[in-house]
């Protein structure tokens, strides 16, 4: 099973070691007793469900525009028999303040913005703590990873309607996360699977737990010490599956490569430095061509 880390443990060094070990061996773990109120998580899920229950025309008032990362959109995916499946998504930048564009934030339900902003504050604190532990696990100062990867936060909701042919359709195809760190809440419908030891493992649903994925940027910063977990999502035949990822990344103009302190003649860099925007462009182009 995917490691579960209890953040209420009074021994912070033990917690940090557990997070580091999970990031080295799995590239994914779940955290419980993380300090984000259960009631807030329930409200976050409630307003997310209510938004996706709105008529399509009303959701389109938040539609993503050409060239924008943010906003509401619908992806039509084909299963292996060329039948259409639907994935609805909304992306909202929450940090830094200069990146926030309320043009894309839902006006309904009325408390959507308040709840999402409160959750964004909590999850930023949690992600910074995790990045501090990961930096220390590399023998570096606490700020090392955060200074590069903790610069841009985007909140996302994935909404996967029921699909009768779910055995032949992935909500998201196998991939590693393009960003550095992803913190995910899901509803009770299973579907997230991670690849380890040559087989797919279903991530156990734990109410109010947060799933943490190591992505490409932290893998590169660590010169490969931390794994970028390969994962996919499945859909349910009868019930709607939803997830609430927060994507933590560098800003587009930042250049990312192995941290210099981690490389030497005996341990040369495994990755070439590259601007994050170029990395994103290259990977998206590759995935499009692959599909």
UniProtKB/Swiss-Prot annotation:
This is Flavonol synthase/flavanone 3-hydroxylase. Belongs to the iron/ascorbate-dependent oxidoreductase family. InterPro entries: DIOX_N, IPNS-like_FE2OG_OXY, IPNS-like_sf, Iron_ascorbate_oxido_reductase, Oxoglu/Fe-dep_dioxygenase_dom. It is an enzyme of class 1 (oxidoreductase). Fe cation binds at residues 175, 177, 231. One of its GO terms (molecular function) is L-ascorbic acid binding. SUPFAM superfamilies: Clavaminate synthase-like. The keyword rRNA-binding does not apply. Its cofactor is L-ascorbate; Fe cation. The keyword tRNA-binding does not apply. It comes from Matthiola incana. One of its GO terms (cellular component) is cytoplasm. Keywords: Cytoplasm, Dioxygenase, Flavonoid biosynthesis, Iron, Metal-binding, Oxidoreductase, Vitamin C. Disulfide bonds: none annotated. Coiled coil: none annotated. It catalyses: a (2R,3R)-dihydroflavonol + 2-oxoglutarate + O2 = a flavonol + succinate + CO2 + H2O; a (2S)-flavan-4-one + 2-oxoglutarate + O2 = a (2R,3R)-dihydroflavonol + succinate + CO2. Gene3D superfamilies: B-lactam Antibiotic, Isopenicillin N Synthase, Chain. Residues 151-250 form the Fe2OG dioxygenase domain.
